[in-house]
């Protein structure tokens, strides 16, 4: 179980979820969060999205949420975990089903969400 702001304790091994790995200061991460928030507002069946934040610089979660018009359940991860999870560079999103990784997305997040979840 992972403790998330806005959601309390969440079992990432249960059900279907998406988990984004974002660096608070990363412009690509901010852009992805903005696009996903817009997509969520336009969709009736957007899946649960949880964010694991790494804080490298001075940007706070509150500032990130204001910049991106987004607010997702979030938790902090340390530098080693962040680099283990992001691959070559952030952002990265994991699609999980029953705790197993169904897909890993490093770009084209909106189209992956639309195709995978048949968003309307």
Where in the sequence are the language-model features?
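Short acidic, S/G/P-rich loop/turn micro-motifs used as interaction or catalytic elements
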Residues: 25-28, 57-58, 101, 110
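Thiol/disulfide oxidoreductase modules built on the thioredoxin-like
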Residues: 80-119
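N-proximal helix/coil linker or "cap" segments that precede and/or mark the start of modular domains
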Residues: 1-2, 12
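Typically the conserved alpha-helix immediately C-terminal to a functionally engaged Cys/Sec
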Residues: 28-43, 108
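C-terminal soluble domains/tails of integral membrane proteins
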Residues: 24, 31-32, 80-84
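Thiol-based oxidoreductase modules, predominantly thioredoxin-like and allied folds used
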Residues: 46-61, 69-80
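Short active-site neighborhood of thiol/selenol oxidoreductases, capturing the structured segment around
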Residues: 8-30, 48
């Amino acid at each position: 179980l992972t403790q998330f702001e806005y959601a309390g304790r969440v079992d990432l091994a249960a059900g279907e979820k998406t988990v984004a790995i974002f660096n608070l200061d990363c412009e690509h991460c901010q852009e992805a969060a903005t696009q996903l928030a817009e997509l969520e507002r336009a969709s009736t069946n957007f899946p649960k999205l949880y964010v694991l934040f790494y804080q490298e610089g001075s940007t706070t979660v509150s500032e990130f949420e204001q910049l991106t018009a987004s607010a997702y359940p979030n938790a902090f991860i340390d530098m080693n975990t962040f680099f283990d999870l992001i691959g070559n560079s952030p952002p990265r999103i994991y699609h999980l089903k029953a705790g197993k990784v169904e897909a890993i997305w490093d770009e084209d997040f909106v189209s992956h969400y639309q195709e995978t979840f048949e968003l309307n």
